[in-house]
Amino acid sequence: MSTTPKHAYRRILLKLSGEALMGEEGFGIDPKVLERMAQEIKELVELGIEVGLVIGGGNLFRGEGLAKAGMNRVVGDHMGMLATVMNGLAMRDALHRAFVNARLMSAIPLNGVCDAYNWAEAISLLKSGRVVIFAAGTGNPFFTTDSAACLRGIEIEADAVLKGTKVDGVYDSDPAKNPDAVLYKKLSYSEVLDKELKVMDLAAFTLARDHNIPIRVFNMNTPGCLRAVVLGEDVGTVICHPEKQDN
């Protein structure tokens, strides 16, 4: 008799911010945080969940300041894409050290470093139980890694985009500034837009809405929270169409 717990998702797209990899550091990658995240992803693989992963690059490069100083936006975005590849390489290595088979695919070709993104191959790898890390965003400037996460989530037919953040979900105001901020448990796409809640940028959010892919926002810094999300526990905030909120 199987003792494997039932889970809410078959295939997910996990979005992690680059800042999450910094831990207590002010820059770069905290090895302890990287190892913990790899172990949490390993738990999902052992549950039989297919995992696609997008990591931001903000821990290594932020283009806003340089853009204000006159740097061309396209150049800055290309540098940001390369930062996500660096994070992807670090995560792939951490997963391999945790005995998890992982592949890194980049939206911009980097022969000898990682694989070029290929939709059909990504699907095949996911079905075979490999973690697939999608790097370099969409491969185009002016699009965020949140947009890349939603795009890849739609392409691989993920059941949801799970966005790991530094807070417990979506609040009615900034919990760092307002101790009385209220955490939402469920929201519709239209409620997020009407209330002007900051979940992700508008291009990414409307992409998810138009393709009816749920978004789950949770605290990646809480150990075990990712596992709780995929097991269907009531943690974080789920955003979807109203008819799906009772499912």
Swiss-Prot record:
Belongs to the UMP kinase family. It is an enzyme of class 2 (transferase). PANTHER family: URIDYLATE KINASE (PTHR42833), URIDYLATE KINASE PUMPKIN, CHLOROPLASTIC (PTHR42833:SF4). Keywords: Allosteric enzyme, ATP-binding, Cytoplasm, Kinase, Nucleotide-binding, Pyrimidine biosynthesis, Transferase. NCBIfam families: pyrH_bact (TIGR02075). This is Uridylate kinase. It is found in: Cytoplasm. Catalyzes the reversible phosphorylation of UMP to UDP. Its EC number is 2.7.4.22. Residues 23-28 are annotated as: Involved in allosteric activation by GTP. HAMAP family: PyrH_B. The keyword Zinc-finger does not apply. Pathway: Pyrimidine metabolism; CTP biosynthesis via de novo pathway; UDP from UMP (UMPK route): step 1/1. Allosterically activated by GTP. Inhibited by UTP. GO terms for biological process: 'de novo' CTP biosynthetic process; UDP biosynthetic process. It catalyses: UMP + ATP = UDP + ADP. GO terms for cellular component: cytosol. Homohexamer. It holds the Pfam family AA_kinase. The keyword Isomerase does not apply. UMP binds at G57, D77, T138, G139, N140, P141, F142, F143, T144, T145. The gene is pyrH. ATP binds at K15, L16, S17, G18, G58, R62, T165, Y171, D174. It comes from Pseudoalteromonas atlantica (strain T6c / ATCC BAA-1087). GO terms for molecular function: ATP binding; UMP kinase activity.
